[in-house]
Amino acid sequence: MNKVHMMTAGALALGLLAGCNQGNTLSVTGGEPVSYQCEQGKKVQVRYFSLSDESLSFIKLSLPDGKDYTLPQAVSASGARYTDEHEAVWWNKGDEGFVELRDQDGEWQTAYNDCKQQ
């Protein structure tokens, strides 16, 4: 009897695993570079991405100093906000945005301001 229960449990587990594999395959969409001209002639580049089911949006932020950040979209009252909550934030609304970075004391400081889409 114990052997029958084991075989039934094994068959059930295989059925569940097979069912998990038949879900929709996700892909990443977007990625075209968008350039922004900021104060003092600095340029930042943002690539906007999302999963094909739109469950996640994120960006690749490239700064003039050569640093790159991959930032998921976060809750925002107005416009869009992308942040890792540790080092960088990209805020944008319409054709404009700005970048905040943490300083040595852990405080957010605006690093690139008044950035306008080119």
Q: Model-derived features: where do they sit?
A:
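C-terminal motif of bacterial Sec signal peptides marking the signal peptidase cleavage site
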Residues: L16-G19
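Mature extracytoplasmic domains of secretory-pathway proteins
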Residues: Q45-R81
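C-terminal partner/receptor-binding element of secreted or periplasmic proteins
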Residues: K93-Q118
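Bacterial signal peptide processing site
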Residues: N21-G23
